[in-house]
């Protein structure tokens, strides 16, 4: 059981760890001009990641999600996964990726200990996918998903950002896609960040619109588990797959928060849209600093706010989602 509990009684057993800020896509809602390196980046190394994960595991965390940027750009990703997977107490190692390198690299990740896969796939239509992401790579991603099924990965999820006027008419196609595929598709409300205000105003779509369509089509909301994340899950008796709705602008979205974040440069972020980061990297250089690292993490939890400030237009330190991995 997690020892990480904040002043609002929320318990944290899930860490989202960014491995890089770099990305090979140019998604219109995130990095439309592509990744621009700020000097020579120095992201967390394998040894530092090992010390970090051991600390969180000692505090009761059991799930680690590797994010980016695009984590598959790390050449040492197999080693990172193996390092994380062998930490005592870690039961689930997941990755969120754009999926372009799955056909080539997924078998190695699986052997290293990967147990769950999330793939960003904002459209089922090839031309639309190219328009949104800046790359015509949907066939490779579909190939990678088939490989994930063949390897027997127990959890496969797809993430699609809801974009008004770009992909908001695809729900019937997604329903058909899930009829024979045991995937969970997550529709995510577009979130305002530091550099996308105009884009947000043009393309934000409330998730309620999708929920109404799901209910009208005979889908039913499933009971939420006590340790579930923010998604509202919907199922249908005639479909193998499920649909999740992640609506950060909905009431009580932050009430069940169960995750913390660490950036690719080693800063603890208590909230995706928090106003500050807590540097952990100085305590990741020696095994002897383990106890000091535990103390820094637990002390900072007392500063976690009840909720984000998105409704007030507050986006915190997040210039775009590639900087912290969502």
Regions found by a protein language model. Name each.
Residues 70:
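Conserved G/P- and acidic residue-centered "switch" motifs that form tight phosphate/ATP-binding loops
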Residues 43-65, 73-188:
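Radical SAM/AdoMet-radical enzyme domain recognition
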Residues 25, 126-127, 252, 278:
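Glycine-centered loop/turn positions within well-structured domains
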Residues 35-39, 103, 125-132, 194-198, ...:
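A short acidic, helix-capping loop that chelates divalent metal ions and anchors anionic groups
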Residues 7-47, 272:
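Canonical Radical SAM [4Fe-4S] cluster-binding loop centered on the CxxxCxxC motif
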Residues 1-14, 176-180, 190-326:
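Auxiliary Fe-S-binding modules of radical SAM enzymes
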Residues 26, 30, 74, 127, ...:
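Residues that scaffold the ATP/ADP-binding catalytic core of kinase and kinase-like folds
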Residues 19, 66, 185, 266:
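Residue-level signature of catalytic and energy-coupling elements of molecular machines
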């Amino acid at each position: 059981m997690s020892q990480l509990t904040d002043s609002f009684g929320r318990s944290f057993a899930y860490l989202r760890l960014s491995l890089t800020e770099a990305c090979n896509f140019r998604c219109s809602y995130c990095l439309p001009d592509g990744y621009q390196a700020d000097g020579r980046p120095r992201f967390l190394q394998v040894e530092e990641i090992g010390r970090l994960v051991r600390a969180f595991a000692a505090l009761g965390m059991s799930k680690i999600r590797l994010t980016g940027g695009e984590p598959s750009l790390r050449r040492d990703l197999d080693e990172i996964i193996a390092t994380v997977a062998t930490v005592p107490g870690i039961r689930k190692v997941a990755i969120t990726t754009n999926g372009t390198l799955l056909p080539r690299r997924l078998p190695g990740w699986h052997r290293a200990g990967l147990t769950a896969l999330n793939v960003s796939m904002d459209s089922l239509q090839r031309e639309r996918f190219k328009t949104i992401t800046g790359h015509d790579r949907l066939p490779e991603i579909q190939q990678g998903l088939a490989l994930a099924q063949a390897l027997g990965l127990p959890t496969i999820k797809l993430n699609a950002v809801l974009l008004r006027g770009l992909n908001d008419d695809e729900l019937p196609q997604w329903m058909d896609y899930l009829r024979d595929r045991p995937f969970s598709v997550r529709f995510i409300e577009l979130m305002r960040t530091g550099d996308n205000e105009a884009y947000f105003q043009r393309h934000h779509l409330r998730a309620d619109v999708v929920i109404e369509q799901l209910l009208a089509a005979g889908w039913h909301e499933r009971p939420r588990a006590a340790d579930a994340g923010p998604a509202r899950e919907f199922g249908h008796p005639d479909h193998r797959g499920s649909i999740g709705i992640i609506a950060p602008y909905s009431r009580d979205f932050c009430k069940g928060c169960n995750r913390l974040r660490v950036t690719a440069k080693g800063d603890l972020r208590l909230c995706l849209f928090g106003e500050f980061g807590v540097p952990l990297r100085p305590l990741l250089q020696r095994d002897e600093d383990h106890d000091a690292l535990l103390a820094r993490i637990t002390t900072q939890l007392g500063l976690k706010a009840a909720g984000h400030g998105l409704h007030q237009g507050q986006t915190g330190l997040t210039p775009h989602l590639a900087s912290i991995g969502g």
